[in-house]
Curated annotation (Swiss-Prot):
Annotated positions binding Zn(2+): 434, 437, 458, 464
This protein's UniProt keywords: DNA damage, DNA repair, DNA replication, Ligase, Magnesium, Manganese, Metal-binding, NAD, Zinc
Stored InterPro entries: BRCT_dom, BRCT_dom_sf, DisA/LigA_HHH, DNA_ligase, DNA_ligase_AS, DNA_ligase_CS, DNAligase_adenylation, DNAligase_N
UniProt family annotation: Belongs to the NAD-dependent DNA ligase family. LigA subfamily.
SUPFAM superfamilies hit by this protein: BRCT domain, DNA ligase/mRNA capping enzyme, catalytic domain, Nucleic acid-binding proteins, RuvA domain 2-like
Protein name: DNA ligase
Keyword Acetylation annotated: no
One term of GO molecular function: metal ion binding
PANTHER family: CHROMOSOME TRANSMISSION FIDELITY FACTOR 18, DNA LIGASE
PROSITE patterns: BRCT, DNA_LIGASE_N1, DNA_LIGASE_N2
BRCT domain boundaries: 643-720
Pfam families: BRCT, DNA_ligase_aden, DNA_ligase_OB, DNA_ligase_ZBD, HHH_2
Binding site for NAD(+): 57-61, 106-107, 140, 163, 200, 316, 340
Length: 720
């Protein structure tokens, strides 16, 4: 199964992700990718191990969809531990573990007729078949239960296991033996010597209602839905409890098998029925996408009358030979897909539109709703995506709206019921100032393409409380002010204690602490020595390289490299600020091209996007106040000038392996001071590779490309 039905009125999955994946910066993508991984892992554990899911099927699918879309857009985030390569959750320690010789994979999902047509076309393309060539598919209901694998040796049930993480499941053999639908011995012809029969343990709706009535009468826990009841019943340590629960089983797949009784999916499932299993009577064979969709509609129409929960229809290539040719991709087979039913919708009143400010300054509109139940979950908030979506749908406060829990971001406002709009309502005006700090909020424009960013962002990064902890954490980070002993944990605590609210506060902390009634050394986790060490570390950073100073300000799009480029040109923070202010055109939200603007974009490597971000930053008066206050406490050191006559000036250099005479940061600084560009990877554009002991793939690639390779000693000889 892919996801649970919710048992809670709210969940972390309702965190609204309104920024389209294509608009995420690499840093934003990495941060969200990590957060999504943690969230999905938690939901997997709740669903597969604890039988206590807290998000709906649609919510979970949307989280997975977002996670995979980020990996597709930013392939570098897909590591060996990516959730894209995993299924389910690790088995519980309460049960013995069973290894699946053939992994129990999940299925890819689709939600529209167009996606079904594309699935069929994709299968044919992979098989080098023409559009008119015929491929048969099976169609069957997608049961909302708990996946289980039953291992038979010489026709006898020997081991039963849950899906677990797909590679290893929980041993539930004794509990499975109590389910009447699961034969202890396989009867009939064609039973192989060994076979794993796979299917779904579920509970019929009538049995679920009767069980809950008994539970309530005995003043015991009642279950939220049939799926939870089935999973909780199967995963009992006492098999007598499982025996008392009305569990059922549909057989529909297999894993390891010494032989198979047929060459088609449908034929093998027919054999399951002959051997004593219950199979789904609604399974049919279709020969094209139109047939698949027609059967989907038929099952959807019968859904309420089936007597058990389903959440879609599964399509599988019928020929086992074609299945073998198609193979697998990531965590699912190419030859199968689950066509999910649309999420349920409900109508309610939009009471207000709240603007939330994210840690990067993004303004996200959230609809505050009269609470309404959608698919068994109480919804009181929904995303409105961004101001363009609000305008496109003409969403207004007081409107009656349709809310849905499905799609890219959920829950969401689908549409307005205009005939119920109250008299005198006015179009919503999206704020142009941050509700958290009052700073100007802007939408970036690519001056070359004219494309306007969908997201409006606060420009008051250094004074905005919604962004402050993240901004302060960045300010003290290693490549910025690099203050030892002042990490994210300490920054967050100091901010919550009211000790630090802006960068300049860091440098007045010791003075203020001496006058405070509650000194730092008397707070939990601190003492005289640790406080003294922190104050000493802060004092050491009262002088800092000017490019580090600018990088530490956290100006959007200004990383270490761009900070260096800007400060090599402007020299001082004051000159950079003056240049930015000179480029501001009164009454215009975006620069149009005066001399100051042309000067900034004329800097090598500084384009329109970076220049506009710098101008917007210094265009906010309170940002300038913060910078002025900081300059009273800190002295930025001028950048060392590039050596124009250096033998490596203008060349791209890569350092690899262990450096023995300098750190990697020192090597980078030296090379840049000599006018070189330092890259992190080797390419055809690389001019020189400096290789120390232990150099690996970068050295090999350099040799393959014919790039000059030298040792660390030869580097010092070269640059003098």
């Amino acid at each position: 199964m892919t996801a649970p039905k919710s048992t809670a009125p709210a969940s972390t999955a309702a965190t609204f992700r309104a920024i389209p994946v294509d608009d995420l910066s690499p840093a934003e993508a990495a941060s969200e990718h990590k957060a999504l991984a943690q969230e999905i892992t938690g939901h997997d554990a709740a669903y597969y191990r604890e039988d206590a899911p807290v998000v709906s099927d649609a919510e979970y699918d949307a989280l997975r969809h977002r996670y995979e879309a980020i990996e597709e857009r930013f392939p570098g985030l897909r590591g060996e531990d990516s959730l894209s390569e995993k299924v389910g959750a690790a088995p519980s320690e309460k049960f013995g573990k069973v290894a699946h010789k053939v992994p129990m994979l999940s299925l890819a999902n689709c939600f529209s007729d167009e996606e079904v047509v594309e699935f069929v076309a994709r299968v044919k393309r992979f098989l080098n078949l023409g559009p008119d060539d015929e491929v048969a598919f099976t169609c069957e209901p997608k049961i909302d239960g708990l996946s289980c694998s039953l291992h038979y040796e010489n026709g006898r049930l020997t081991v039963a296991a849950t899906r677990g993480d797909g590679s290893q499941g929980e041993d539930v053999t004794q509990n499975v033996r109590t389910i009447a639908d699961i034969p202890e011995r396989l009867a009939g012809k064609g039973v192989p010597q060994t076979i794993d029969v796979r299917g779904e343990v579920y509970m019929a709706k009538a049995d679920f209602e009767a069980l809950n009535a008994r539970q309530a009468a005995a003043e015991e826990k009642v279950f939220a839905n049939p799926r939870n009841a089935a999973a909780g019943s199967l995963r009992q340590l006492d098999s007598s409890i499982t025996a008392s629960r009305p569990l059922k089983f549909f057989a529909y797949a297999w894993g390891e098998a010494s032989d198979l009784p047929a060459e088609t999916q449908f034929g093998v499932v027919e054999a399951f029925a002959r051997w004593g299993f219950t199979t789904n009577p609604l399974m049919v064979v279709a020969k094209d996408a139109a047939g698949l969709i027609a059967h989907y509609r038929s099952i959807e129409a019968q859904r309420a009358l089936l007597g058990y929960d389903i959440d879609g229809v599964v399509y599988k290539v019928n020929s086992l030979e074609l299945q073998r040719r198609l193979g697998f991709v990531s965590r699912s087979p190419r030859w199968a897909i689950a066509h999910k039913f649309p999420a349920e919708q409900a109508t309610t009143v939009l009471e207000d539109i709240e603007i939330q400010v994210g840690r990067t300054g993004a303004l996200t509109p959230v609809a505050k709703l009269t609470p309404v139940t959608v698919g068994g979950v109480v919804v009181s908030s929904a995303t409105l995506h961004n101001e363009d979506e609000i305008a496109r749908k003409d969403v207004r406060i007081g409107d009656t709206v349709v809310v849905q829990r499905a799609g890219d971001v959920i829950p969401q406002v689908v549409r307005v019921i205009e005939e119920k709009r109250p008299a005198g309502s006015k179009p919503y005006e999206f704020p142009t100032h941050c509700p958290a700090c009052g700073s100007h909020a802007v939408r970036e424009v690519d001056t070359k393409s004219g494309k306007v960013d969908a997201v409006r962002r606060c420009t008051g990064g250094l004074i905005c409380p919604a962004q402050m902890v993240e901004r302060l954490r960045h300010f003290v980070s290693r490549n910025a002010f690099d203050i030892e002993g002042l990490g994210e944990k300490q920054v967050r605590a100091f901010y919550e204690w009211g000790l630090i609210a802006s960068p300049a506060d860091i440098f007045t902390l010791e003075t203020r602490n001496a006058r405070s009634l509650q000194r730092l050394e008397n707070r939990d986790g601190w003492g005289k020595t640790s406080a003294a060490n922190l104050f000493a570390a802060i004092a050491e950073r009262r002088t800092v390289a000017v490019d580090r100073f600018v990088f530490a300000l956290g100006i959007r799009h200004v990383g270490e490299t761009n900070a260096k480029r800007l400060m090599r040109h402007y020299g001082t923070v004051e000159a950079l600020e003056a240049g930015a202010l000179a480029a501001v055109i009164p009454g215009e939200e975006h620069p149009k091209g005066n001399e100051a603007w042309q000067e900034m974009i004329g800097i090598d490597g500084i384009g329109d996007v970076v220049a506009e971000a710098v101008i917007e930053f210094f265009g906010e008066p309170r940002n300038r106040e913060v910078v002025t206050a900081l300059l009273k406490e800190v002295t930025p050191e001028p950048m060392e000038q590039v050596a124009a006559a250096s033998p490596v000036s203008g060349k791209t250099v890569v350092f690899t392996g262990s450096l023995e005479k300098m750190t990697r940061d020192e090597a980078k600084a030296m090379a840049e001071r000599l006018g070189a560009k330092v890259a992190g990877s080797v390419s055809a554009k690389t001019n020189l590779v400096v290789a120390g002991p232990g150099a690996g793939s970068k050295l090999e690639k350099a040799q393959a490309l014919g790039v000059q390779v030298i040792t660390e000693d030869e580097w010092f000889e070269l640059v003098g």
